[in-house]
Amino acid sequence: MKRNRILALGLTMITACSLLSGCTSTSTDSSASSESTEAAATSTSSDEQVVIYSNADDEAITAMSNALDNNGYEGKYIFETFGTSELGGKLLAEGTNLEADMVTMSTFYLKSAQEQNNMFLSLTFDVDTLEEVPDYTAPITSQEGAIIINTELLEENNLPTPTCLKDLTDSVYAGYLAVTDVKSSSTAWLLLQALISEYGEDEAQEILSKIYENAGDHIESSGSAPLKLCEDGEVAVGFGLRHQAVAAKEEGLPIDYVDPTEGNFSLTESVAVLDKGDDTNEMAMEMAECIIKNGREELQSYYPNALYEGESLDSTNKSAYPKTFSEDLTFELYEHHQEISEAAKP
């Protein structure tokens, strides 16, 4: 879900930024020096290393790297991260010619890439998820949408607390609202799914048009930007990822979150292993299993939604209106909903 790229060998790295857009590439290794990085790359040939492409945020990269490093794979893989749209485009265009041996990516993109290119292997390890998933995917994270509010600004400006997304069409929020453009961030798709599911496409477009009008210049390209703007006191209301708002509130910031009555829709990111025939890197399947078996505890500390049997969710992190869109989430549906969003723009 980010635009930056990182290169990691061995121990986990943390990227230079956490936004979903435009960052400078960064590389680190376990010894934190460029000389050591070059030495590590030289001593371990690229043929032996598993190349992992990912759209994940910093926290997820950290958790996955920790799982691999702590279970014998230090120095045996390379992580490279991309924005969701960029990596999705590579999957669809390149198929099995992709340089990567393994990807972690928005599941809806993986589905479309598999249908178009038949590029992923069936996983050879047990994936005991709470809900049925394609046999070539194992989910690593689930992220829900919610309304985010700055409690101090609401009070200072006598603004009502919204209870649903349709409330955001009220002109009282003009100049106080930030949302994300679905053309640049899949986070915004959570808002689109909720509106379309509740009101149908035509009314959803009308509602979205009024929301965009109230947001004005704050139709952001980054999914985390509305929360950041709320934290900085630049806007009073935003739409973003629920777990990030929960964390901000727990840190003592004047941030709260509202589960919209239209529903808390979610997107998952999953791991998949590329099928390259005789050139398939066998260690990629081992690493995929390692991430799921040894990384989920840390992953769930950042992305609390339960995905696997035996996992639980505390009351704070349990949304009030969890819902699933009526149609299967695919890149093609994402494109269609982007068209609705474009038509709604001023």
Predicted regions: what they are:
Residues 148-153, 268-280, 299-302:
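A bilobed periplasmic-binding-protein/Venus flytrap-type ligand-binding module shared by bacterial periplasmic
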